[in-house]
Curated annotation (Swiss-Prot):
Full protein name: Aspartate carbamoyltransferase catalytic subunit
Gene this chain is encoded by: pyrB
Regions crossing the membrane: none
Organism taxonomic ancestry: Bacteria, Pseudomonadati, Pseudomonadota, Betaproteobacteria, Burkholderiales
Oligomeric and partner information: Heterododecamer (2C3:3R2) of six catalytic PyrB chains organized as two trimers (C3), and six regulatory PyrI chains organized as three dimers (R2).
Keywords, sorted A to Z: Pyrimidine biosynthesis, Transferase
GO CC terms, sorted: cytosol
Length: 320
């Protein structure tokens, strides 16, 4: 049965769905990161497979487009030896008016064991988790503006890999925070793991007004936001989610909030620069930073496979 306190956990407090980092105990987040560390080396093997999900069926249901996230989930599932189905939503019954729950019911009848769901509506993975059979697991691959927990977890893994400990870090999250589910997941991950200073940096039109309860410091200039930071996480402008004139122009945005090598010098000399992708060079970040020695953007992608392997193996190993 699902826990009344947290629908992601069973009555024993074990992870059966990953819907959000918010509300997860630190012990579970740490367990995911520790498990991911054991999977990183699979990348370097001649045969990049482990048999943990052999015989299991993983259905990737991406109601929103995403090449990077869908691909890494597919690779992660296959490296766990699962059978993987990528549903073509544009040609599925969902595009013909079938309800979300009817789609899930029909796919469940095909003996699905795990659904990876990306949806434009916040809360869609929660709804699915409430209606699947006890042996079926749900992983949120991004829902509306709400959450992107595996991206948040891979960001936490990347920070831990390079900085070892969260207890003395200053982390700046820069850009379109208003529309960013990644920012919310990163904030929850950082506060859960004990990061003492999390800064949210952006123009007033792109920073939500309700962040104070999340324990972050809001900065409206890039210079203030990244000064002496250990980690700088850059976010793209999500123009597809914007309505109205939230920004004067991409050029004006880059002038004020684009990360250049000169501005990066305000951060600590050993600061790392992260980005969840896709990157818009010359809008939120200069190419010289993307390709520079402080960027760890490609390692994020590599670590993302291991983190998603960890999440799938953990939830699939627990019963509702």
């Amino acid at each position: 049965m699902l826990s009344k306190r947290n629908p992601q956990l069973n009555r024993n407090g074990e992870l059966i769905h990953l819907l959000s980092i918010e509300g997860l105990p630190r012990s579970i987040v740490t367990h995911i990161l520790d498990t991911a560390a054991n999977f990183v080396s699979v990348n370097d093997r001649e045969v990049k497979k482990v048999p943990l999900l052999r015989g299991k069926s993983v259905f990737n249901l991406f109601f929103e487009n995403s090449t990077r996230t869908r691909t890494t989930f597919e690779i992660a599932a296959k490296r766990l030896s699962a059978d993987v189905l990528n549903l073509d939503i544009a040609r599925s019954s969902a595009s013909k008016g079938e309800s979300l729950l009817d789609t899930i019911a029909n796919l469940s009848a095909m003996a699905a064991d795990l659904f990876v769901v990306r949806h434009s509506e916040s809360g869609a993975p929660y709804l699915i988790a409430q209606h699947v059979a006890p042996h079926v697991h749900v992983i949120n691959a991004g829902d509306g503006r709400h959450a992107h927990p595996t991206q948040g977890l891979l960001d936490m893994y990347t920070i831990r890999h390079y900085k070892k400990d969260f207890s003395n870090l200053t982390v700046a999250i820069v850009g379109d925070v208003l529309h960013s589910r990644v920012a919310r997941s990163d904030i929850h991950g950082l506060t859960t793991l004990g990061c003492p200073e999390v800064r949210v940096v952006g123009p007033r039109t792109l920073v939500p007004g309700d962040l104070s309860h999340m324990g972050v410091r809001v900065c409206h200039t890039l210079e203030e936001g990244i000064r002496d930071a250990d980690v700088v996480i850059m976010l793209r402008l999500q123009n597809e989610r914007m309505s109205g004139a939230l920004l004067p122009s991409s050029q004006e945005y880059f002038k004020s909030f684009g990360l250049t090598p000169e501005k990066l010098r305000l951060a600590k000399p050993d600061a790392i620069v992260m980005h969840p992708g896709p990157i818009n060079r010359g809008v939120e970040i200069d190419s010289a930073v993307v390709d520079g020695p402080q960027a760890v953007i490609l390692p994020q992608v590599t670590f993302g496979i291991a983190v998603r392997m960890a999440v799938m193996s953990i939830v699939a190993g627990n019963e509702a």
